[in-house]
Amino acid sequence: MKKYMVVENYKEGCFEEIYERYNVKGRMFPIGLHFLNSWVNKDKNICFQLMESNDPDLFSEWFERWKDLVDFELYPID
């Protein structure tokens, strides 16, 4: 499977709401998108997630579910 680094830039004032949703609904990944690890910097409102998938189009589906709270950047890892 191909690995990807996802950079989540939390929208201003949304940190608490993001984690409230996460605690209720989980990460809301589509089937086929796999979480490996994550690192959060609360002071900078940013999260880095190491992920893998055989279908990069699944990221768009996942991003759509969080777009009201998070802006995403996606980087394939070679």
Model-derived regions, located:
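Short S/T/G/P-rich N-terminal loop/turn motif that feeds into the first structured element of a domain
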Residues: M1-I46, N54-L58, D78
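A common structural junction motif
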Residues: G26-R27, W66-E73
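Short, exposed beta-strand-loop hairpins at the edges of beta-sheets
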Residues: W62-E64
